[in-house]
A protein has these predicted regions:
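Protein maturation boundaries and topogenic segments
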Residues: 1-76, 143-164
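Generic structural signal for buried aliphatic residues
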Residues: 53, 68, 86, 127-128, ...
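Short, surface-exposed secondary-structure boundary micro-motifs
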Residues: 58, 73, 91, 99, ...
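Glycine/Thr-rich phosphate-binding loops of Rossmann-like dinucleotide-binding domains
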Residues: 63, 104, 137
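Short glycine-/acidic-enriched loop or helix-start segments at secondary-structure transitions
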Residues: 64-65, 98, 139-140
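Structured, soluble extracytoplasmic/luminal domains of envelope-associated proteins
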Residues: 81-129
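Beta-strand-rich cores of mature extracytoplasmic or soluble domains
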Residues: 114-164
């Protein structure tokens, strides 16, 4: 005996499942996570040109050493919080509140030719962001501290796409 297939129920179930899947994907990648292919060398060697970055948009609490995506897809490492004093000397040594931070960055921190003057106190509601490749000064050294509401997300992991 053949059973009669109810096409309306079948198509309705497929439509509901497809709609739920689309909603879950929209919430995941439109609200919670941000996917971006990184272009540039200012975060080398931590983040390389062509890496796929996944950042968490919901995080609004950022600590020192967090790598964040901000402004128009810029990526940088937070080195100072609101109220901290940042100083960079002529030898390329950075001091936060008078102390040299324990960093694994192999590059000296150079001053920007134009930009802020030192010592610099990070304003309330902002963070001081530096590139890992410290010769590239397109970060807080040129553009002042970044407002926390301009941070798009905290980098939670990345996928190397070339040049392992």
């Amino acid at each position: 005996m053949k059973q009669k297939v109810n096409h309306k129920k079948y198509y309705r179930a497929v439509l509901i499942k497809t709609g739920l899947f689309a909603l879950v994907m929209f919430v995941t990648f439109g609200v919670i996570l941000n996917l971006k292919i990184y272009h540039g060398t200012n975060m080398y060697p931590g983040v390389r040109d062509g890496d796929l970055m996944v950042s968490l948009r919901l995080n609004k609490y950022f600590g020192n050493d967090d790598v964040v995506v901000y402004d128009n897809g810029k990526v940088g490492r937070i080195v100072a919080q609101p109220g901290d004093t940042v100083d960079i000397n002529d030898e390329g040594v950075i001091k936060i509140n008078g102390y040299i931070p324990a960093e694994t960055i192999p590059y000296k921190t150079v001053k920007a030719e134009e930009g802020i003057s030192y010592p610099y106190t990070v304003p309330e509601g902002s963070v001081f962001i530096l590139n890992d490749f410290r010769n590239d000064t397109d970060d807080s050294r040129e553009n002042e501290a970044v407002a926390k509401n301009k941070i798009k997300g905290k980098l939670i992991f990345l996928i190397r796409r070339r040049g392992f």
